[in-house]
UniProtKB/Swiss-Prot annotation:
One of its GO terms (biological process) is negative regulation of DNA-templated transcription. Pfam families: HrcA. This is Heat-inducible transcription repressor HrcA. Belongs to the HrcA family. One of its GO terms (molecular function) is DNA binding.
């Protein structure tokens, strides 16, 4: 890339930085005064004319300065050389706050609240999906001799409870054997494999006695409820942050809020996050969702030991502090994974 192209990118970078900070269209005189561009105002005007002709900036009003377009923001984001890492005190504060969570729900609620505060955008965190989880522990509790409570705890800390109605009452000895058999079949296995194992166990016993019947009924509940009908859940925080930037959405705020409420679009975007530590930025129409055309989504995956638990990120206007947002999303995702992986 030639020096003229490099210089024009520095002009674009300055326009993005100033517009994000001030919300005001930026003129050539302002750029020369605020930034050490090393060229005259006339040269900056010429560079801005080229940037506008190529679609990187636009003039919103006849006598105003220029503002970045989606293409301009994309060029800016693609050429971020390095993201300034958070300070050690900031990282420690994030980790301490998340570690104080008493369980999975509390950790994720804290994460979404923290990310919304750090970025001043809407924060979104996807619950760990059962399809990517393994069974850490299975507990069987007798509510009555003929009514059981199954408690499945995954390696991500997710807890699911289901009731099983038995055909015949079982005694303490049979309950203990049932607990051992189901645990041996499922614990330590991914959910899909655990469901196959518990189904095979039920088929082998084939309801031959009271214990076999109990295993069959428990297996049916575990397979049908916990595996085949997994629920995608999403936590949102900081929705009010969007309403403070209504003008940035150019009349599209309502559709963005509707997309967040419906969750389908956001879940699709988060589902595309398959690699923890890699942050993806989608600007405006890059979200491929008409409702989100006025917004940007900065997202990543969180997980532990190379395993992805779910996606997370922020939604905000295209006029966004991209370097700061990327750094905060990456940091919170890293520490969610650390906290959940250590439990």
């Amino acid at each position: 890339m030639g020096s003229a192209d490099d210089r024009r990118f520095e002009v674009l970078r300055a326009i993005v930085a100033d517009f994000v900070a001030t919300k005001e269209p930026i003129g050539s005189k302002t750029l020369v005064e605020r930034h050490n561009l090393g060229v005259s105002s006339a040269t900056v005007r010429n560079d801005m004319a080229v940037l506008e002709a190529e679609g990187y900036i636009t003039q919103p009003h006849t006598s105003s300065g220029r503002v970045p377009t989606e293409k301009g923001y994309r060029e800016f984001v693609d050429r971020i050389d390095n993201v300034k890492p958070l300070s050690s005190s900031e990282r420690r504060a994030i980790l301490n706050f998340l570690e104080s969570g008493v369980d999975l729900d509390d950790v994720l609620r804290r994460a979404v609240r923290l990310l919304a505060q750090l970025t001043r955008q809407v924060a979104i965190v996807q619950y760990p999906t059962l399809s990517t989880s393994s069974v850490r522990h299975l507990e069987v509790v007798a509510l009555t001799p003929a009514r059981l409570l199954l408690v499945v705890i995954t390696d991500t800390g997710r807890v699911d409870q289901r009731i099983v109605e038995l055909g015949d009452a079982i005694d303490e000895h049979e309950l203990s054997k049932l607990r051992d058999m189901l645990g041996q079949a499922m614990e330590g296995k991914p959910l899909a494999q655990a469901s196959i194992a518990v189904s095979d166990l039920a088929s082998h016993l084939n309801g031959s006695d009271r214990l076999g019947d109990a295993v069959g009924r428990a297996a049916t509940v575990l397979v049908e409820t916990l595996v085949e009908h997994t629920e995608e859940r999403l936590l949102l925080g900081g929705t009010a942050n969007l309403t403070r930037n209504t003008a940035d959405f150019g009349g599209s705020l309502r559709s963005v809020l509707e997309a967040l409420e419906e969750q389908v679009v956001v879940l699709r975007l988060l589902a595309a996050q398959q690699e923890a530590g890699k942050v993806t930025v989608r600007i405006g129409h890059e979200t491929e969702a008409e409702q989100m055309a006025g917004a940007s989504v900065v997202s990543t995956a969180y997980g532990s030991s190379g395993k992805v638990y779910g996606g997370m990120g922020v939604v905000g206007p295209t006029r966004m502090d991209y370097p700061g947002t990327i750094a905060n999303v990456a940091a919170v995702a890293l520490y969610i994974g650390e906290v959940l992986g250590s439990r």
